[in-house]
Amino acid sequence: MADPHTRYRKFNTSVTYPEQNLDNDLCQAVATRGGRTLYLRGQCPQSLDDAQDIGSHDPAIQTHKVMQNIRQLIEEAGGGMEHLVKVVVYITDVRHREAVYRTMGDYIKGVHPVSTGLVVSALARPSWLVEIDGTAVIPD
């Protein structure tokens, strides 16, 4: 499927951060045309149906749940992960960065969204290590 968006200066984090064990397809900018913009609330390691925590303190497992939630919400809106144009990643400990980004990379391989990462002092629940919000533009 052709990319519905124009992605500028694509790169892979294995090149930009060779000292880290990462493999994320990202880009510097995304231009969209038409379509519907889907703004995702920051997704956390909990069920979308009942807000129950997943009960893991492993950053990779938490990130899998966060990315599954993101994928599910985009699909419920009629899109796919290829329509993801931006993510903002919040982590509570810089030591979790590689695990979080490696796991996220499994979900965005070939997508190349723009990405911003922040280390924050805390998230809404003490057990949460990662939160990711996203923006998708789904073609009409």
Range-by-range predicted roles:
Residues 1-85, 92-140:
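N-terminal presequence-like segments and the immediate start of the first folded domain
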